[in-house]
């Protein structure tokens, strides 16, 4: 909404692209497209992936009435300057609340259509009776940014861009034929399970040449949604383990959940008093008939009192990440909290390009260079540059050589040493447009 989120509210004018409907909600193109798709395909089996923009940033609403409703309900006041920061703590952001209600309304329209529409392939029945609905999210709520507090995932810790429970524990509702109603479950599942589950529920053949990372949840859903023994790996073993790997952005962590316990491995722990290398939490106690909630808030770190448990889970995490050839975060030689070995980072002395071949010469300063990658783009200077990685070869004489892929417009070299420091050449000054580096090619 331009110039700011206190402008551009929807009206009832016919030529308003966001015009209000009979219930006073703004027009939503994604919802209309979803309804159109169902209407055009309800005479045959269909799959609809309804990925709404709500409640993603930017946090705003086209409904002035909803905004006013939540300003009053929350007892807050909008700032005189519409561009001012919104730093009200907790769940007190009226813009976000309005977005949540809009989301509820739009999903309701889709469900209402399924409930009210006859199934052309099943006379006497409605579409909803032959449709599975899965409602979930790709991550926990975004709690805030530098300019505003959006929401609070209390009692869970943190939110989006984190592997703490506030970032990974998300809503999940599954309904459809053969699934018991109103059953709450603490069984551990994730989004990777949806593909094999949908194939199973639809009676579709599983591709023989595909290795599924997720499990088929159909037995769990159809028999007893509270029984974790019904979630099994391809080899028949009960699944009791999941991992999450977020080595970049603000997270810089990996986690593993085994049964009741969750281990958090923080990569940004050296010279950082705010982070422990390992954190261990017992989320549940499954010793009884049903799992009992223990510490999903992740407030009691057991790493010191259960060091053996922490070590064994950390080894298991390493094994899993090694199997999938996971990447890890590197140290920045310019970082003020980087280890002292940053003084041993190599220095790139020169580079030379001949046709599509490029050679870099470097000097080691106490740490061996163990890996090199060429980072390149085919559309340098475009509004949205897309960059790729390809291995460079380390050869005798402290040199790295690589072949430029056809169409390369810009490139740079990454050298990684034995202490996990990364040296880029040339230095990247503009992270949004890496082609604007110190050296032009």
Segments (PLM) and residue ranges:
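Core domains of carbohydrate- and sulfate-ester-processing enzymes
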Residues: 1-13, 50-52, 56-81, 144-170
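Formylglycine-dependent
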Residues: 1-61, 81-97, 180, 276-278
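Active-site rim elements
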Residues: 17-24, 86-97, 159-161, 178-188, ...
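Active-site regions of oxyanion-processing enzymes, predominantly non-cytosolic
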Residues: 27-75, 117, 123-134, 165, ...
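A long, amphipathic alpha-helix that forms part
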Residues: 31-38, 74-131
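Histidine-centered active-site microenvironments of extracellular/periplasmic hydrolases
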Residues: 58-63, 113-179, 189-190, 269
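C-terminal cap/loop subdomain of S1 sulfatases and analogous C-terminal strand-loop tails that border
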Residues: 141-163, 180, 187, 192-289, ...
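Long, internal low-complexity/basic segments
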Residues: 292-371, 375-379, 391-410, 414-441
